[in-house]
């Protein structure tokens, strides 16, 4: 994964969850699993985080170069070819929106917010087209607008 702190935190959470699950949900008649068995569960939980291999993509370069940005948008709309990182984004985007980016790395969360702010503020037509595909309820836009109005209210 590349983020030892993240793995360590997931490992601690996984261990607690695994211990709670084995304590609370023991099936009658089956032996209680040994205390050393949370390892497979920890691996499954770590696997749930999105791959970080594209975390170092230069978002500013993409957002500031019309041709690059349009290529990404076309990929996400399904009207153009996808680079490997855009393809991965297209695959995980529905889940990331549905789960409020809970599986995102810190860089991915920051990048998602940055790109979303840019599209909503600077390219509303593109945002509306993508929103119809990935967030028809407008949930993310509503959250962003609420956050933006709160930030404007604060001194």
From Swiss-Prot:
Cited Pfam families: OS-D (PF03392)
Primary location class: secreted
Signal peptide from the UniProt entry: 1-29
Gene3D superfamilies (UniProt xref): Insect odorant-binding protein A10/Ejaculatory bulb-specific protein 3 (1.10.2080.10)
This protein's name: Putative odorant-binding protein A10
Tissue: Antenna. In the third antennal segment. Expressed in sencilla coeloconica.
Cell membrane found in the keyword field: no
Intrachain disulfide bonds: none
Annotated compartments: Secreted
GO cellular component, one term: extracellular region
Keywords: Secreted, Signal
PANTHER family listed in its UniProt record: CHEMOSENSORY PROTEIN-RELATED, EJACULATORY BULB-SPECIFIC PROTEIN 3-RELATED
Protein family per UniProt: Belongs to the insect A10/OS-D protein family.
Keyword Secreted: yes
């Amino acid at each position: 994964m590349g983020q030892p702190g993240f793995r360590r935190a997931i490992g601690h959470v996984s261990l607690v969850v695994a211990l709670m699950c084995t304590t609370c949900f023991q099936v009658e008649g089956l032996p209680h699993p040994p205390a050393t068995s949370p390892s497979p569960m920890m691996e499954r939980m770590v696997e749930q985080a999105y791959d970080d291999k594209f975390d170092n993509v230069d978002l500013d370069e993409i957002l500031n170069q019309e041709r690059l940005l349009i290529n990404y948008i076309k990929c996400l709309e399904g009207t153009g070819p996808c680079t490997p990182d855009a393809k991965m984004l297209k695959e995980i985007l529905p889940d990331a929106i549905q789960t409020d980016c809970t599986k995102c790395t810190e860089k991915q969360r920051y990048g998602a917010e940055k790109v979303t702010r840019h599209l909503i503020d600077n390219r509303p037509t593109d945002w509306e087209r993508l929103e119809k595909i990935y967030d028809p309820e407008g949930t993310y836009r509503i959250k962003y607008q609420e956050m933006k109005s709160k930030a404007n209210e604060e001194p």
